[in-house]
Structures are given as C-alpha cells and as structure tokens.
Amino acid sequence: MTDQEYMLRAIQLAKKGEGWTNPNPMVGAVIVKDGRIIGEGYHKKYGELHAERNAIASLTESAEGAVIYVTLEPCCHHGKTPPCTEAIIEQKIRKVVIGSRDPNPKVAGKGVQMLREAGVTVVEDFMREECDQLNPFFFHYITTKTPYVVMKYAMTLDGKIATKTGASKWITGEAARKEVQHMRHQYMGIMAGIGTVLADDPMLNVRVEGWKSPVRIVCDSKLRIPPDSQIVKSAEKYRTIVAYADQKNTEEKIKILHTMGVETIYCPDEKNQIDLKKLMTDLGSKGIDSILLEGGGTLNDSALRAGIVKEVQAFVAPKLFGGVAGKTPVEGIGVEFPSEAVELKYTDICQIGEDIRIRCQVCEKKQEESCLQEL
C-alpha cells in the first residue's frame, strides 16, 4: 500500500465517528510497520479515547520504528483524555504523517513541536484537503465558538417548498428523506421556526435506529409554542431549547415549559425579535457546534440576513407545484438588484433516488442584519 492509501484508510476510519464525536473532530489513525498495518483506530465518541490511543490499543506487535498516519494533528494537552503526543513518543513511533492542522489554541502546532523535540519525524499537510473535509463543523466552532449552520430544504423544480395551501408532504422521495435523517444524526442541533411548529407539529428527531437525535431548537419570539405540541411533550426524551424575545405575559408559560423539560433562551434585539447572532453565541456556549436549519421561508431569510448560514443544501424533486401563492425557500422582501444576491459556490451535486441534492457554500460578504422577522 502507498502513503495515500494508508491516509485514505485513516479517513475511512474517522468517518465511523460521524455524529458521535461532536463537538470534537472526527479523527482516524493507522499505524504501519514494514509495509503492514499493525494497528488502527478512530475517535468513537466525545469524551472517549482519541484515534491515536485507540490505534495503539489495537497494536498486534511493537510500534517501535513504525509510522502513524493521522488525519488531524495529535493533541498535546490534558482534557477529557490524556495527550496523544505522549502515547506516540512512549511507543517509540519514528514518524508521524498528519493531514489537517488543529486550529484549537491548545494544540495549534504545539503537538508537532512536542513530537519533533522528542526526535520524531513529522510530515504535515499530507492530503490536507481530503482530511479538512472531515471536520468543517469543528474548524468553524473551535475558532468562532458558534455553530456551523447549514440551511436545508426540499423544493420542486419550480422552487416551491409547499403548495398554496401550505401542504408539503411529501415533496421528495423516500431515499432523499432517509438522507435527511442521516443529516440530522450528523448535527448537534436542528432549528425551526414557530411557524413550522404551528403548521406541521413536527418531532424534529431521528427515526432510524442506531442514530442519535439532535438538540431541537425552536425560534419563537412571542413564546407561542403550544404545551401540547409534539416537541414540548417529548422534551424529557429529546433535549429541546426554545428561543424567545418578548417577555410580555410569558412568566407562567416559561414555568410550564421548564416543568416539561424545555430549556429557554431569552435573546431579544432592539425590536423585541430574536437576535440570531446572539442566539448562535448562546448555543455555542452550550457546546452546540453545528445546526441543521430546517426552517420555512421566513426563518431562512432571517438567517441569511443575519449572516449565520455557512452552507445551503437543497433537495430538488422532479415535480412542479406552480402558483404565485406557493411557498418558496427564502421569503422576506428580497433584494432589489441581482448584484445584492447572496452568492453561493457549488460544492457538490448528486442524485439521491429520484431527487437531486445541491450543496453550496455561502460566499463571505458584508452582512447587514442580525434580527429575525416576526416568527
């Protein structure tokens, strides 16, 4: 096997931790000696051993003189687990091949420095692009302390997310809906507006055995969420957060929600609407590193104007709804000129069942507003 193949194996291993390691990164490691893999591992779950230590634990023989391929710079600090650099040095591994650099201020080159000072050869940035693709959530969160937000919606080929009556089940096919369940497993949080809750009474959980459900976040300026909604009734089972902005006549409602297991966050702007940027800071402080935004057109518009959306994923179905009254993915007042559009960059287009998924990065540009419209 080649160096590239060993690192590809490490990447493959890292992906096994998808959805379980947040807010930690996904990491894989492969230990090679005399052209043979003698140990491999990955970070399985937040709070548990890191990839390098799991790889060392799986060794079939001494690692003295071996090479370890790891997708992310080894840690060098004591956190929930001991430093991986110490374990590498103790095992007398002679060479470390690293994919991604760790922007965590507690690491950020210090791990490499410690290894080199111990006489270990270090190769950096090997297949870095491929390794970086593993952890967009982690890289964003560790440097900003706010969640990486992906706006997701399903629409018809003529750009409708619902008919003129508001009906939307189902736009996409079963395969696309299964992929959305997988996406929910990947993210720490899922966010919707009160309009979606009142119209659809959704659970916003994961319905596939073996996958985890994200923290459910509802943007509800005036705290209109019904205590008998599915989200509130299941809050003891699935962590639920309701963000609100208007304190008028809400004291009793808040007590009821808290009794039922719902957490609340008060984050108003000067217009008594939810300040989305502040909400992201508050959610980040709770350890939420990523959010799947499954909002309607109003919340999507507000999120884009607030500048919190980093990526857009659109599932497009081969059907047409028509009608000027049909709901669209992004509402609000819109822009006056094409030059004012939110610019996107295609990153992937693929077919899932009968539907197409389009993934785009949001291009950085001047952000203007941080408040929600009335929700």
What does each model-identified segment do?
Residues T2-G17, N22-N24, A63, K80, ...:
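Enzymes that bind and transform nitrogen-containing heteroaromatic metabolites
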Residues P25-V27, M127-E130, G295:
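Short, conserved alpha-helical segments within structured domains
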